[in-house]
């Protein structure tokens, strides 16, 4: 009897919580999308991309435009080469 009662209570709890959790996940997804597309985050992404380009240019000794034309395997070899 206790097992059946526990099973029924768990099923009712799942049926009640599923819409609530769906609402939380929808809110979280909407908030994350708004944050990701905000002006501040766009500026930070731009700064991070520029920093990465400058790092690559410094590491391989080339300009960022030249570094973008190097094949991926060669690029990885250059990054891992330590004289």
Swiss-Prot record:
It is found in: Secreted; Target cell membrane. Residues 1-22 form the signal peptide. The keyword Cell membrane does not apply. Keywords: Antibiotic, Antimicrobial, Fungicide, Ion transport, Membrane, Secreted, Signal, Target cell membrane, Target membrane, Transmembrane, Transport. Coiled coil: none annotated. It comes from the Eukaryota. Expressed by the venom gland. One of its GO terms (biological process) is monoatomic ion transport. Residues 66-83 form a propeptide. GO terms for cellular component: extracellular region; membrane; other organism cell membrane. Belongs to the non-disulfide-bridged peptide (NDBP) superfamily. Long chain multifunctional peptide (group 2) family. Amphipathic peptide with potent activities against both Gram-positive and Gram-negative bacteria. Is the most active against the two Gram-positive Bacillus megaterium and Micrococcus luteus (MIC=4.0 uM for both). It has relatively low hemolytic activity against human erythrocytes. This is Heterin-1.
